[in-house]
Swiss-Prot record:
One of its GO terms (cellular component) is cytosol. Keywords: Cytoplasm, Nucleus. It comes from Schizosaccharomyces pombe (strain 972 / ATCC 24843). The lineage of its organism: Eukaryota, Fungi, Dikarya, Ascomycota, Taphrinomycotina. This is Uncharacterized protein C26H8.11c. It comes from the Eukaryota. It holds the Pfam family 4HBT. PANTHER family: UPF0644 PROTEIN PB2B4.06.
Length: 175
């Protein structure tokens, strides 16, 4: 049901049809052994997160819906999971800036603003703030979507990512 509501949202449809974005669900498939893919397989996320990545490397938009399995306190999404989702969204947003289209997190700062409640739809919006060779700086916000009400800002993050020069990341990443 949450996924049906998501794909019906005008903003989702607009992103899906926008040629400036790549649309993907990177954690789908049995071969993916990542942390988030395991959460999807164990139904801790209602659906596999949707990623919309600007081809220009300017940022990304990510949608997801956590279940109560991801609560730290009653009905509050665990902060570690929130930071993981912010890290992934920030990373995917800057990857188009790197020749290999891959990189690693060097620094990630998260500020929690309001409780992120379980069983709600969330959107992360990221923006690349600076690109310098194999280095990228980015920021993003986690928003709780509440139907026709204004979104609630739950967390903010900023990150610094690099494309390593001597590490062939493709050997370390399953596609």
């Amino acid at each position: 049901m949450p996924e049906t509501k998501l794909v019906a949202l005008p903003e989702f449809q607009e992103l899906k049809s926008n040629d400036e974005y790549i649309s993907m669900q990177p954690y789908k498939g049995e071969d993916n052994k990542s942390y988030i893919a395991n959460l999807v397989r164990h139904n801790a996320l209602t659906f596999c997160p949707y990623y919309f990545i600007e081809k220009s490397g300017k940022g990304s938009v990510v949608y997801f819906h956590p279940t109560s399995d991801l609560c730290g306190y009653k009905n509050i999404v665990h902060g570690g999971f929130i930071t993981t989702m912010l890290d992934e969204a920030l990373a995917f947003g800057v990857f188009p800036n790197f020749p290999s289209k891959m990189g690693v997190t060097v620094q990630l700062d998260t500020t929690y603003v309001a409780p992120a409640l379980c069983s709600h739809l969330y959107k992360i919006v990221t923006k690349t703030t600076k690109v310098e060779g194999r280095k990228c700086w980015t920021s993003g916000e986690l928003l709780r979507l509440n139907g026709s009400e204004p979104p609630v800002l739950c967390a903010k993050a900023s990150g610094f990512f690099v494309e390593p020069s001597k590490l062939n990341l493709e050997h370390h990443v399953k596609k």
